[in-house]
């Protein structure tokens, strides 16, 4: 009998056991979640701070600001680069600068700077407000003066906080000032030299007056941008079909800043794939290095002449090994990046070609467009009557493209997994390299349309959020992004047009309604106040009645309690032999 009871209870207990998985799950999925939460460097998910964080893992230059990956939160915090007052040149330098001047000062050491002169030489001057120790590279980092002088990032002058100092306006070779005026001057110098090189290799064409290329209208989208979006959607459809069949692809307005991912070293062992044959020559452009840890770097020594092109040092990664182009067994050290890749050098600048006289250190990278994804299930703020009523907008959840394509998982598996994934994105990276300038102008045209239509909206006092091209409809403007709708068949070019038609139909219904257009058009402005006014009116009207009813009920309950008589209960006590009868009161 006991055996039967034990058997029955064992079955009951086993039926209540549920399957669980021990451990912390797939670390690659965790990495993808972390990177989606913290975002891309230039998105500044950690916000803007006045001074650089004390402890950071890496630094990425974003033109107008510098992003720092903070160790305690891993979110990217940004610091705006110093600005120049309206009067940028103050004439002679302060007296303190006549005794000592510095080669370079980091941009985080001051808030504003100006130009001044000492003799016939131009310097930069500012009041030091911060403290920063110069960044020293590893012992094998190639520099101008050898491995014993391996300074790669400038610092603040020691003991000069609160004092005025001066430093050279011309950038120091291979030394970065953290995105300050010297780094900007270096970019200008390099861009000019590449423009001269481009003109010498590709002379400008003179068009016949009757054969000028047709100007692209502002209501049309550039074919390069459409091809890029189509390629992105094709890859997304191959990796996550459920997401690709109903989503929005959002491009950042303004100049594009693509993501730079580590290039698969197995495809270019010891940089044997580099060559000096003809390759597309594009101007240097800014990228966002992503997931760079230990990299194989290549460098060329400084020749100490005026013909050298200083591309800077790749300070965003730790170079585990170096390939010296200067001593390579080649007739020259000019290099072409392998197909679908670029050289990423100092200041996060990307190059498709490095001429013979280049100097600095670079890494190979594959590009990925800076595109965010909005799932179709995510409600986007298409204007409706609730926008006229002042309904608060909901934040849009954006998914970075590298998360949607599963690139973070591939990167975390190492070189082999990355190689398999990056090979699939070769076409996309090559297309992005070729069309980065055209895409920039296209999105800028769209941004101009957004700004122009925004002025019209404000002038007409219409609370429209759908800011698109006036003819045909191009994209949906969301959070300074230009979003294109896509389904399983590809990019839907008439999606915005349909939304516009629906919006116009609803707007006409409101306009034709005499209730909405009464009071000389002031009703749309009064409607957001009607809710609070109605609530206040209800409180003032029914509040006293409810209060009186409540007080009456409480008073009645108190009176009923007081009116109850005190009931006295008697019972006979137990009698003992020697006692008599007693009564007790309870």
From Swiss-Prot:
- Intervals of motif YXXL motif: 570-573
Superkingdom in the source lineage: Viruses
Start and end residues of each stretch annotated as Immunosuppression = 458-474
Domain description from the entry? The YXXL motif is involved in determining the exact site of viral release at the surface of infected mononuclear cells and promotes endocytosis. The 17 amino acids long immunosuppressive region is present in many retroviral envelope proteins. Synthetic peptides derived from this relatively conserved sequence inhibit immune function in vitro and in vivo.
Q: List keywords of the entry alphabetically.
A: Cleavage on pair of basic residues, Coiled coil, Disulfide bond, Fusion of virus membrane with host cell membrane, Fusion of virus membrane with host membrane, Glycoprotein, Host cell membrane, Host membrane, Host-virus interaction, Membrane, Signal, Transmembrane, Transmembrane helix, Viral attachment to host cell, Viral envelope protein, Viral penetration into host cytoplasm, Virion, Virus entry into host cell
Gene expressing this chain? env
The identity of this protein, by name, is Envelope glycoprotein
Q: InterPro entries recorded for this chain?
A: TLV/ENV_coat_polyprotein
What GO biological process terms does the UniProt entry carry, in alphabetical order?
fusion of virus membrane with host plasma membrane; symbiont entry into host cell; virion attachment to host cell
Q: Which GO terms describe its cellular component?
A: host cell plasma membrane; membrane; viral envelope; virion membrane
UniProt signal peptide: 1-22
Q: Entry's CDD domains?
A: HTLV-1-like_HR1-HR2
Q: Which residues cross the membrane?
A: 527-547
Q: Which residues lie on this side of the membrane: Cytoplasmic?
A: 548-586
List where this protein forms a coiled coil.
419-469, 479-515
| UniProt motif CX6CC: location | 475-483
Q: Which residues are glycosylated?
A: 120, 237, 264, 276, 291, 304, 318, 324, 339, 357, 487
Q: How does it assemble?
A: The mature envelope protein (Env) consists of a trimer of SU-TM heterodimers attached by a labile interchain disulfide bond.
Primary role = The surface protein (SU) attaches the virus to the host cell by binding to its receptor. This interaction triggers the refolding of the transmembrane protein (TM) and is thought to activate its fusogenic potential by unmasking its fusion peptide. Fusion occurs at the host cell plasma membrane.
Region listing for Fusion peptide, in residue ranges: 398-418
The record places the following residue ranges in the Extracellular compartment, namely: 23-526
- Disulfide bonds, paired cysteine numbers: 247-250, 247-483, 475-482
Motif CXXC: residue span? 247-250
Q: What processing steps or modifications follow its translation? A: Specific enzymatic cleavages in vivo yield mature proteins. Envelope glycoproteins are synthesized as an inactive precursor that is N-glycosylated and processed likely by host cell furin or by a furin-like protease in the Golgi to yield the mature SU and TM proteins. The cleavage site between SU and TM requires the minimal sequence [KR]-X-[KR]-R. The R-peptide is released from the C-terminus of the cytoplasmic tail of the TM protein upon particle formation as a result of proteolytic cleavage by the viral protease. Cleavage of this peptide is required for TM to become fusogenic. The CXXC motif is highly conserved across a broad range of retroviral envelope proteins. It is thought to participate in the formation of a labile disulfide bond possibly with the CX6CC motif present in the transmembrane protein. Isomerization of the intersubunit disulfide bond to an SU intrachain disulfide bond is thought to occur upon receptor recognition in order to allow membrane fusion.
Q: Where is this site: Cleavage?
A: 394-395, 568-569
């Amino acid at each position: 009998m006991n055996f039967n009871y034990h058997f029955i209870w064992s079955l009951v207990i086993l039926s209540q056991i549920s399957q669980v998985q021990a451990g912390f799950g797939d670390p690659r999925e965790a990495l993808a979640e972390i990177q989606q939460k913290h975002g891309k460097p230039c998105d500044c998910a950690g916000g803007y701070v006045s001074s650089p964080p004390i402890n950071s893992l890496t630094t990425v230059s974003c033109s107008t600001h510098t992003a720092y990956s903070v160790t305690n939160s891993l979110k990217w915090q940004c610091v705006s680069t110093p600005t120049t007052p309206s009067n940028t040149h103050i004439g002679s330098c302060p007296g303190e600068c006549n005794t000592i001047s510095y080669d370079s000062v980091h941009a985080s050491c001051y808030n504003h700077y100006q130009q001044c002169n000492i003799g016939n030489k131009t310097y930069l001057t500012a009041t030091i407000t911060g403290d920063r120790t110069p960044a020293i590279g590893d012992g094998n980092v190639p520099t101008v003066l050898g491995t014993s002088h391996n300074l790669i990032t400038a610092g603040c002058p020691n003991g000069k906080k609160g004092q005025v100092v001066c430093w050279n306006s011309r950038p120091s070779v291979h030394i970065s000032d953290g995105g300050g005026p010297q780094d900007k001057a270096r970019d200008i110098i390099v861009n000019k030299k590449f423009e001269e090189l481009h003109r010498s290799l590709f002379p400008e064409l003179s068009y016949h007056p009757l054969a000028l290329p047709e100007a692209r209208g502002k209501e049309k989208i550039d074919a390069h941008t459409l091809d890029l979006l189509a390629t992105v959607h094709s890859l997304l459809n191959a990796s996550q079909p459920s997401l690709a069949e109903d989503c929005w692809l959002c491009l950042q307005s303004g100049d594009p800043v693509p993501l730079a991912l580590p290039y698969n070293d197995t495809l270019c062992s010891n940089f044997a794939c580099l060559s000096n044959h003809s390759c597309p020559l594009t101007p240097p452009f800014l990228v966002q290095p992503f997931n760079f840890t230990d990299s194989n770097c290549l460098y060329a020594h400084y020749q100490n002449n005026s013909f050298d092109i200083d591309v800077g040092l790749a300070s965003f990664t730790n170079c585990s090994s170096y390939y010296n182009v200067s001593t390579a067994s080649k007739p020259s050290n000019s290099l072409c990046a392998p197909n679908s890749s670029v050289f990423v050098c100092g200041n996060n600048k990307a190059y498709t070609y490095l001429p013979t006289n280049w100097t600095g250190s670079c890494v190979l990278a594959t590009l990925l467009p800076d595109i965010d994804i909005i799932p179709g299930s995510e409600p986007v703020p298409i204007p409706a009557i609730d926008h006229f009523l002042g309904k608060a907008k909901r934040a849009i959840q954006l998914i970075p493209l590298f998360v949607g394509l599963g690139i973070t998982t591939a990167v975390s598996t190492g070189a082999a997994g990355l190689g398999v994934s990056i090979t699939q994105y070769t076409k996309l990276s090559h297309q992005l390299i070729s069309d980065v300038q055209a895409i920039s102008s296209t999105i800028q045209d769209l941004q101009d349309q957004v700004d122009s239509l925004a002025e019209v909206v404000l002038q007409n006092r219409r609370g429209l959020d759908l800011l698109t091209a006036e003819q045909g409809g191009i994209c949906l403007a969301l959070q300074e992004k230009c979003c294109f709708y896509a389904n399983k068949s590809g990019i839907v070019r008439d999606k915005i047009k349909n939304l516009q038609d629906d919006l116009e139909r609803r707007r006409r219904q409101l306009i034709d309604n005499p209730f909405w257009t009464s009071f000389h058009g002031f009703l749309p402005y009064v409607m957001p106040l009607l809710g609070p006014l109605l609530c206040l009116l209800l409180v003032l009207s029914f509040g006293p009645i409810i209060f009186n009813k409540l007080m009456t009920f409480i008073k009645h309950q108190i009176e009923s309690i007081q009116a109850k008589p005190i009931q006295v209960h008697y019972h006979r006590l137990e009698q003992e032999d020697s006692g008599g009868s007693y009564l007790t009161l309870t």
